Amino acid sequence: TVAFGSCNYINEESVDRPGKGYGNGYEIYESIHAKKPNIMLWGGDNVYLREADWDSKTGIYHRYTHTRSIKELQPLLASTQNFAIWDDHDFGPNDGDRSFYFKYETQNAFKNFWANKTYGTDANQKEGIYSTFNWGDAQFFLLDDRFFKSPNDRLTGEKTIIGSTQFEWLIDALSSSKATFKIIVIGGQVLNPSARFENYQN
């Protein structure tokens, strides 16, 4: 059994925007744990970095530890294999892209908190959090839609979301996969033909 989830906003009043906080319903993690999944697959926005967090290693690690500390999440983290990708809010600013100046720090934090089996093309991979793993008769391909992404407002050059290195890695990995089921995980819309903001078509 594979459980999927994303958009894990944990309130912290001192750094949240005015008004009612976005986060609630944390008991969902207890419900997921009760189903005893073999894998929990986190589809991005697993933490929500705030404006106060982006500019420092201290802020980034505070956000991760604060998010991970809620009691409802502990049984799921302790008893289930967890794999993850990121999206904009755990990468950095809203709708973040490759121009984000602190992306290596957020990448390091991500790797420290998520024990994916591999990262990138080899053990020395320094850029991106894409990875793959096998489970039973399925192979999962976890893509990074932020580290290499072109800025939304860029007017020149060819735009990309996953970059050429990751794209070639994906094609090679899919071609050589012997798994019956191949599951691609990415933090944005891919099949929607409408060229809308933050859409693969766009």
Question: Where would I find each of the regions flagged by the language model?
Answer:
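Metal-dependent phosphoester/phosphodiester hydrolase catalytic core
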Residues: 1-202
